[in-house]
UniProtKB/Swiss-Prot annotation:
Protein name: tRNA dimethylallyltransferase
BP terms from Gene Ontology: tRNA modification
Subunit structure: Monomer.
UniProt record similarity statement: Belongs to the IPP transferase family.
The keyword Oxidoreductase appears for this protein: no
Positions of substrate binding: T12, A13, S14, G15, K16, S17
Gene: miaA
Annotated Gene3D superfamilies: 1.10.20.140, P-loop containing nucleotide triphosphate hydrolases
Role, per record: Catalyzes the transfer of a dimethylallyl group onto the adenine at position 37 in tRNAs that read codons beginning with uridine, leading to the formation of N6-(dimethylallyl)adenosine (i(6)A).
Protein source organism: Malacoplasma penetrans (strain HF-2)
EC class name: transferase
Source organism superkingdom: Bacteria
Length: 299
């Protein structure tokens, strides 16, 4: 019988963390945070890490897990999460989606090769990256916006590390899933979501987000922007504003975050098999019953 795992996914600022925490309390579960940036110890102000009280109340895995100077990538995440789950088969885990690709690689059990981290795309413009992707993998280029530099680089790194199209790499390395999943999708009105994103950005900025980046620059020098940790939304704009001695364009950060949330919703809708759509806490008891039934099903 496969290990059963509950997953909560949804766009940023949709309330995933609150729902995951409440479910973990009621199901006596530990939480696995599947986020590409909460894993880092040195950044916190702009990535909505769990509150200290929550971290103390329930075990959260992969939060404050590595230093920004360490190599961290999706392959290492998959290896470590499988080791964690397989060595604790008696425990319940709820996975909180932050980076949908992390969730996708676990659900589909992708066998990932080491990515060539020496491949450097930092000097290429978005247009140059997109043109390169079109030449190497035209089908993949149709799925990615020319403005989404992070995903363009991510796709190119997979393609060039494996000398094959992204689809061929994933198809070749896709094996039978190791676990059974119950996937919960957060549903939230677009206007409400965008207001939450804007309000959260204001709160983060008032909570010394810019000062955090200033301290990172002092501690690590200007080369810090080459670390994966500082590719988190908003950090590049804050970094550039400090280096250029200007005010941070918080409206730009809000706009990029809203665009990111929209892309997340599209990904979730198109890629994942949803078991429960959660839109308000009137549904909570129904959801909890379904989660218990899933965990207790011995099939």
């Amino acid at each position: 019988m496969k290990k059963k795992l509950i997953i909560v996914v949804g766009p940023t600022a949709s309330g995933k963390s609150d729902l995951t925490f409440k479910l973990a309390q009621d199901l006596k579960s530990e939480i696995i945070v599947c986020d590409a940036y909460q894993v880092y110890k040195e950044i916190s102000k702009g990535i909505n890490k769990p509150e200290i009280e929550n971290l103390n109340a329930i075990k959260h895995h992969f939060v404050n897990h590595v230093s920004i100077n360490e190599v961290w990538h999706i392959k290492r995440f998959k290896e470590e999460i499988e080791e964690l789950i397989n060595s604790n088969m008696d425990k319940n885990f709820i996975l909180e989606g932050g980076s949908n690709l992390y969730i996708d690689c676990l659900i589909n059990n992708y066998q990932l090769n080491e990515l060539d981290l020496t491949l450097d795309y930092s000097n290429l413009s978005n247009d140059e990256l997109y043109e390169k992707l079109q030449k190497l993998d035209f089908e993949e280029s149709l799925k990615i916006s020319k403005n989404n530099k992070k995903r363009l680089i991510q796709a190119l790194r997979i393609i060039e590390s494996n000398n094959n199209t992204k689809k061929s790499v994933l198809d070749k390395n896709n094996k039978e899933p190791l676990y059974d999943f119950f996937l919960i999708r957060m549903i939230i009105d677009r206007d409400i979501l965008y207001k939450k994103i804007n309000d959260r950005a204001d709160k983060m900025f008032k909570n010394n987000w810019r000062e955090e980046v200033e301290q990172l620059i002092k501690a690590n020098g200007n080369s810090m922007m080459n670390t994966n940790a500082l590719k988190a939304l908003g950090y590049d704009e804050i970094y550039n504003s400090i280096i250029e001695n200007r005010e941070t364009n918080l409206d730009l950060i809000k706009q990029k975050t809203r665009n990111y949330a929209k892309r997340q919703e599209t990904w979730i809708r198109n890629k994942f098999k949803i078991d429960f759509n959660f839109s308000n806490y009137d549904q909570y008891n129904e959801l909890l019953d379904k989660c218990k039934a899933f965990l207790n099903d011995k099939k």
